[in-house]
């Protein structure tokens, strides 16, 4: 019982199939040595005590395997316990556990397999690296042109390939040799200088007729004017009204708010140019003025606009106040029997709807009918009417005449 437990290894102990110190030789001094006679009686208990993968470690010995085979024949197919050892003639490992000896068949077979593996490795030396003095096989020229292929297979990789490629006259087929100008185009602005002003940087490089480089300003000036751009900066431009050297071709004036050009391209003043544009004929010299007439524009300030409109409203309110209301004038001009003089008959003014004058809701439109007389009104009769002046009488008559 204790011996069977001693045979079971601990969980952290591994079984060595080819170890000579344990369970193989009785004279090895192993502390767990079991005679072969007791092994068959303990084999039924071994599968329950130790894991499955470690069972072949015990049956690896030839003596134990024979004893286990003899004892396992007692178990039939219907036995609930499986035999602990494999059938005779089969081994748990694909290779033999005996060391290869000089005269053993197993050792000879292993030596032959080892030699074959070494020969197979020698046939493919590329996995171990290529020596410096070696050359590539002939399969590479199939991927290259006829000019480059001989240089790759001519000799070892000692730099001769690079020299042969540099010595090719035309280079690779389908590609032309790079030109120096194209290399300079890859770096725009490098080493360029304007031949006119000497500028080294510009947004756009241009060329003149001879192919020299010009900066953008000089190139545009040369393109527009046909001459080289002057290197001296022009002075500040004078105002348009006092531009030096300009004179109107029509009226010979030198002062204007805007200089124009006629159909011939000659400079003219603003007045002559507008007159020619509107009328199609030159402006007469009699219309020339010493002072420039400016346009009277409306004031932009709102406060000034309100003030001017208020003052104009006050000025226009006075004549409106002097104009009498038709109702008032009609009531004033209405003849009363107390004021009428029998000796001096006056013009009789009849009013329709005079009874509606006192009504505030009555319409304000009144219809008057005049009966003209051949005699003039005496001043004494007109002076008796209170509240009427000379101006009021004239305006009242004008209002009645227009009605």
Swiss-Prot record:
Coiled coil region boundaries: none
Biased composition (Low complexity): 72-82, 90-100
Gene name, Swiss-Prot/TrEMBL: GATA5
UniProt-annotated location(s): Nucleus
Taxon lineage: Eukaryota, Metazoa, Chordata, Craniata, Vertebrata
Gene3D superfamilies associated with the record: Erythroid Transcription Factor GATA-1, subunit A
Zinc finger (GATA-type): 194-218, 248-272
Main location: nucleus
Any single GO CC term annotated in Swiss-Prot or TrEMBL for this entry: chromatin
Species of provenance: Bos taurus
Residue spans of biased composition, Basic residues class: 294-303
Official protein name in the record: Transcription factor GATA-5
